[in-house]
């Protein structure tokens, strides 16, 4: 989630914070007995280019490459409506609880927030929002974004 260097932080620490963010987001989505419908993503190419600088053109390709069109969104919504209860149950069984992760971080003295790494609190929510364009895999960030849940979630991340 951190595209630019952040003095005083190590990549592994950044990955650790991002892991907790993903765990919180996953827990929030798995708490939903029914999902809101996925929406077709409207991709703002120019915004992606601005946010990702010299990697912007590649990130635009990534975003478009994994975005669902209207038909794929309709099909996925039908599938999620049909399969969500079983999928949710299965994921809840195997998900490592956030509390266990937080306890391990605390026991090892590992920072658990971007603020704990000394990163500007205004930066991290934007990093969470823009991270979905970095990988060509459809991730929990894409699910949350397409469900309309990512922006509200990200604004509370620190």
Task: List PLM regions with ranges.
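Acidic catalytic cores of enzymes that act on phosphate-bearing nucleotides/polynucleotides
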Residues: 1-28
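C-terminal charged capping/lid subdomain of soluble metabolic enzymes
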Residues: 32-158
